[in-house]
Swiss-Prot record:
Its cofactor is Mg(2+). One of its GO terms (molecular function) is magnesium ion binding. Keywords: Cytoplasm, DNA damage, DNA recombination, DNA repair, DNA-binding, Endonuclease, Hydrolase, Magnesium, Metal-binding, Nuclease. This is Crossover junction endodeoxyribonuclease RuvC. The gene is ruvC.
Amino acid sequence: MTLRVLGVDPGLTRCGIGVVDVEKNRRATMVAVGVVGTSPDESLDQRLLLIATSIDDWLDRYEPHVLAVERVFSQLNVSTVMGVAQASGVVIAAAARRGIPVALHTPSEVKAAVTGSGTSNKDAVTKLVTKILRLDAPPRPADAADALALAITHAWRAGSGAAIATTGPGSQSLTPAQRAWAEAEAKARRAR
């Protein structure tokens, strides 16, 4: 069976979106790629609405089995982190409304899966995404290439169980850190 993964590189100014079909033999094919751009001159609610509407369109058009979203990580620029977190929330909610599982991947996980090194730069990721997907030209801007890399990463890391091994609703597969967190929360609730 072919696994269809919609990758999202979330951002408030540029939100990269890429759809990839991956065969059991790991052969990946690009279905679609794009970037949703919003203007800093617009109000926050209008920017998030544009991202939400665009994601809804992509989900309805391409019907992915799973979403792969870049995990928000701490940066020095708090406003950038907030924008990424807000865009991520809109994307995750859109998937949840449709019952589509969502998997979160860190930037270093994506770099390691696509290039073999978790410290690769964006140019290396773009170059290898172009090669893996057998594209005539690199996807631009970098947000588009990153979205495709997220989709590839999820399919390759999760293997044949990629649609199941997610952090979404009904997930039976937790990372060790997620399992430890859940156990700590359960223990704290019992102690009350």
